Amino acid sequence: MIYALPPYAQALGIGVDPSDAASPVLWFDYSDRVSGRPGFLHGGAISGLMEMAAIAALQSELERRGEPARLKPVNVAVEFMRGGTQQRTFASGTVTRAGRRVALVNASCWQDDPAKPIALAQLKVLLSPAE
């Protein structure tokens, strides 16, 4: 599946890993547009990357099921585990539950090792029929 990233994702320089993983992996490189305090990523950029990864995972899951829907994030909870440094940063999402009206998606953000996340997020998303 090819994802059309929204303008916000394009502004952050987010890319999609072309691998055939079950859930898309999104990434961005360290730059001035994602920097926070000297040498570290901005928390908002990390949150944005995880939100985009969660939405991509949910879109992928709904497409697999043949159930296209319009998505409206309702709540995003983020936990920062450690500071992100000046290197490529990745994120992916996992759909925990996708009902008829609501979906729950977890996202993880890492740099060197997916087993050592720099941040975790949980999104609640309203689903409505695609028009």
Regions from the language model: what does each represent?
Residues M1-E131:
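Terminal targeting signals and extreme-terminal segments of soluble enzymes
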